[in-house]
Amino acid sequence: MDYKSGLIPDGNAMENLEKQLICPICLEMFTKPVVILPCQHNLCRKCANDIFQAANPYWTNRGGSVSMSGGRFRCPSCRHEVIMDRHGVYGLQRNLLVENIIDIYKQECSSRPLQKGSHPMCKEHEDEKINIYCLTCEVPTCSLCKVFGAHQACEVAPLQSIFQGQKTELSNCISMLVAGNDRVQTIISQLVDSCRVTKENSHQVKEELSQKFDTLYAILDEKKSELLQRITQEQEEKLGFIEALILQYREQLEKSTKLVETAIQSLDEPGGATFLSSAKQLIKSNVEASKGCQLGKTEQGFENMDYFTLDLEHIAEALRAIDFGTDEEEEEFTEEEADEEEGVTTEGHQ
């Protein structure tokens, strides 16, 4: 049984297989050796080395001084980052299976007859294949067009040489673009890290600011409680003094009321001898009672508590002026301190 013929299908399947054997860098069929990346995509080792060198311009290859550190590049198919050791792309594993499939595919293609129309033909000369490239008009054409046709006065070159040259140029452009994409990806990663660090720093300063304001709130609450306690203490002392006076005056009023009642009863006494026996003492008691009205009194403005008034406008202004410090303010403050120290030093020498 011919196993090779069973491996290579016919028709469109051949074209699909060929697409799977195309290198994403040079856009041609893989050139041996073929290396397999950790992401399971394949590259020609030469193409892999080109994009590796483009992404790591300071890495020296086998021909130069040996670098003890590896490098990295991204797979052109999936953008997976490939990390190399000090051997570079020569440390990548060869994909022998793909190389064998390429050999079988080429054998099968060479054994098949060339299908009609598989090679591009000239539109002016239908039996002539396009085999040269007009450098003047920058279009592929045939030999008859150069000898007899529209491109007699044009400069031409072999189609294959121009084909290989432009393919090489395009491959170089792809390598440069892939390397550029790697640099852009690095910048994106740096910017993402910058966003993360910015958020972390913002959270940290917010926490610090909240703690400082909480400290201010605690100081204000403590001072408020202290001042309210002093007002309450003063109130209690004054009220105690006033209530003591009220008690004294009530006792005096009670004594005076009883004395008045006794005196009125004495006035109703019809007998002179009886009246006179108590009148002198009653008169003396009334005089003393009238003097008792001279008990202590509160001074004018005793009830006033205005001396506990606070002027907090300057503190309120200072609170409103709270703001974040700037580097310029810190520099000015440092310069002022330096000037003051210099002045003190000068005076000391004098």
Swiss-Prot record:
Ligand binding (Zn(2+)): 122, 125, 145, 151
Cited CDD domains = Bbox2_MuRF1_C-II, RING-HC_MuRF1
Q: Which GO terms describe its biological process?
A: cellular response to dexamethasone stimulus; muscle contraction; myotube cell development; proteasome-mediated ubiquitin-dependent protein catabolic process; protein monoubiquitination; regulation of gene expression; response to denervation involved in regulation of muscle adaptation; response to electrical stimulus involved in regulation of muscle adaptation
What if the gene is knocked out? No visible phenotype under normal conditions. Under amino acid starvation, mice continue to synthesize muscle protein and degrade less muscle protein than wild-type, leading to a decrease in the blood levels of free amino acids. Besides, mutant mice display higher creatine kinase activity under amino acid starvation.
One annotated Gene Ontology cellular component of this protein: contractile muscle fiber
Q: Where in the cell is it found?
A: Cytoplasm; Nucleus; Cytoplasm, Myofibril, Sarcomere, M line; Cytoplasm, Myofibril, Sarcomere, Z line
| Domain of life from the UniProt record | Eukaryota
- Signal peptide limits: none
SMART domains cross-referenced by the UniProt entry: BBOX, RING
**Keywords annotated in UniProt:** Coiled coil, Cytoplasm, Metal-binding, Muscle protein, Nucleus, Transferase, Ubl conjugation pathway, Zinc, Zinc-finger
Which regions form coiled coils? 207-269
Q: What induces it?
A: By hydrogen peroxide. Up-regulated in response to amino acid starvation.
Catalytic reaction list: S-ubiquitinyl-[E2 ubiquitin-conjugating enzyme]-L-cysteine + [acceptor protein]-L-lysine = [E2 ubiquitin-conjugating enzyme]-L-cysteine + N(6)-ubiquitinyl-[acceptor protein]-L-lysine
Q: What does this protein do?
A: E3 ubiquitin ligase. Mediates the ubiquitination and subsequent proteasomal degradation of CKM, GMEB1 and HIBADH. Regulates the proteasomal degradation of muscle proteins under amino acid starvation, where muscle protein is catabolized to provide other organs with amino acids. Inhibits de novo skeletal muscle protein synthesis under amino acid starvation. Regulates proteasomal degradation of cardiac troponin I/TNNI3 and probably of other sarcomeric-associated proteins. May play a role in striated muscle atrophy and hypertrophy by regulating an anti-hypertrophic PKC-mediated signaling pathway.
- Subunit arrangement? Homodimer. Homooligomer and heterooligomer. Interacts with SUMO2, titin/TTN and GMEB1. Interacts with TRIM54 and probably with TRIM55. Interacts with TNNI3. Forms a ternary complex with RACK1 and PRKCE. Interacts with CKM.
Relay the domain remarks. The RING-type zinc finger mediates interaction with SUMO2 and localization to the nucleus. Also required for the E3 ubiquitin ligase activity.
Name used for this protein in its record = E3 ubiquitin-protein ligase TRIM63
Tell me the organism: Mus musculus
